[in-house]
Regions:
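Extracellular modular ligand-binding repeats in secreted and cell-surface proteins
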Residues: 1-94
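Sequence signature of WD/YWTD-type beta-propeller architectures
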Residues: 89-452
């Protein structure tokens, strides 16, 4: 600007200052429901401690008058420690006698029930179980499970562990295996566990499957390779799963195939090609698969075709199917059951000279949206006859996809066997004979179950 005679000039002194202040970070209050405490009772688990942070402010002063103040940097000096209060959630559910050992995962911890649903005992209290693997040994004496890794997810997803369920002071046993996402299971009639691994990745879904299989003894030693790393067929990047028969035969399922594993020679023996599902997403569908209690049959979910113009890979229909090795027959037992029907077989019962067992499975409520649908628990005879709805009732919300867990044997005087399911975060037991359903837990934290 050009100044003229008589113009006034005002000079403003501007000062920029940086100052730091230490500010208290108040602790949060966390409430944890616990069924070991009576309803309404509270217990302080961890006292809260305030944290401390250092904030750097940028101040602008004009002629010693502050016109702005803004935070430009925050550094946490001391992390706040949350106050954790345990609140009793012990509801007055009638105790039930149960056979065997029932294990369940709640709030990242492993619990077991024995003899009665009133007898509950925590066996793993680390709070970091991720639920990918949660399986009892055939005799219920050991539980194998996975724990979240402390390393970044693109370096290590989880680690595989075991614990003896019958010790009053259980000690965790590291199986020296990591990145176990799809499968780990006790090998029948041995003291060993079989497992399959993946390689962590930063991109979705978070891993690249190895489609391998290892065997490791619970007593230690070097794992033995049963299957070498392979591409795994169509959508093999997602992975594959396996299932042991009661007498130790091994079947496999992958997105495009089911078959048997030669555990001595280390190769796959395909039984049936499956039309792989195109999910148009970063996950793949693996057919749920289980052996019959007779060691001579396989129950699995197959991908059924759809009418034109829907392509076979995009068909929304999935049938519950069985293979009988004794009759060399493959039969669709339930049409349009849903992709997560997850069959589960009961223990064998003897009726005269005949040995029979039942099959529990899930029926999708919305047949053409079974990937997002809720389900209802059904039961049928092994040949697909006498199918009936068990739980929940038709006028109630369905259950989330899961594999039902049969009781290892029936109780005296019981019309059927108990089947355990997770419903709305709680454990329910359903009598397969008369359909009576019993709620066992009430804290809403339960996510996985197994029963042996």
């Amino acid at each position: 600007a050009i100044l003229s005679n008589g113009d006034n000039i005002t000079l403003t002194r501007v000062v920029e200052l940086f100052e730091t202040e230490q500010v208290v970070r108040p602790f949060e209050r966390q409430i944890v429901r616990n069924e070991t405490l009576p309803e309404g009772e509270t217990r302080l688990v961890q006292a809260g401690v305030n944290g401390l942070e250092e904030i750097t402010f940028r101040r602008i002063l004009e002629d010693e008058v502050e016109i702005s103040k803004s935070a430009v940097k925050t550094v946490v000096l001391i992390d706040a420690l949350p106050e954790i209060v345990m609140v009793g959630a012990q509801a007055s559910y009638t105790p039930l006698n149960i056979p065997g050992t029932l294990a369940y995962l709640a709030g990242g911890n492993a619990w077991i029930m024995e003899n009665s649903t009133a007898n509950r005992r925590i066996i793993v209290s680390t709070g970091d179980l991720d639920g990918r693997i949660f399986s009892l040994s055939p005799n219920g004496e050991y539980l194998i499970f996975t724990r979240k890794s402390n390393k970044p997810a693109d370096e290590e997803i989880n680690t595989l562990w075991a614990v003896r369920t019958r010790n009053l002071d259980p000690k965790l046993i590291s199986l020296e295996a990591s990145n176990v996402v799809h499968f780990a299971e006790w090998i029948p009639n041995t003291n060993s566990v079989a497992y399959s691994t993946v390689e962590p990745r930063s991109a979705a879904p978070g891993w690249q499957a190895n489609n391998d299989l290892y065997r490791v003894s619970i007593t230690g030693g070097t794992p033995r390779k049963l299957l070498s790393t392979s591409s795994g067929g169509v959508y093999g990047w997602w992975g594959m799963s396996f299932s042991y028969s009661p007498n130790g035969k091994l079947a496999y399922a992958r997105p495009d195939q089911i078959g048997l594993v030669d555990q001595d020679a280390g190769y796959l023996k395909p039984l049936l090609d499956i039309t792989p599902l195109n999910t148009h997403s970063d996950w793949a569908w693996i057919p749920p698969l289980v052996w019959g209690a007779d060691n001579e049959s396989l129950f699995f979910v197959s991908h059924a075709p759809a009418p034109a113009p829907i392509t076979s890979e995009e068909s929304p229909y999935f049938d519950l199917t069985a293979i009988s090795f004794s009759s060399e027959a493959t039969v669709a037992l339930v049409q349009s059951a849903g992709m997560f029907s997850s069959p589960s077989v009961s223990a064998i019962r003897s009726t005269g000279r005949e040995k029979i067992f039942q099959v529990a499975y899930l029926q999708s409520i919305f047949i053409e949206q079974s990937d997002t649908s809720r389900y209802r628990l059904m039961v049928m005879d092994r040949d697909g006859s006498n199918s009936k709805l068990l739980f929940p009732p038709a006028d109630s919300n369905g259950i989330e996809p899961q594999t039902p867990a049969w009781a290892p044997q029936a109780l005296e005087g019981q019309t059927g066997d108990f089947i355990a399911v997770v419903y709305q975060g709680n454990l329910w037991l359903i009598d397969s004979g008369n359909g009576d359903a019993y709620q066992v837990t009430g804290d809403g934290l339960l996510s996985e179950i197994d029963w042996k």
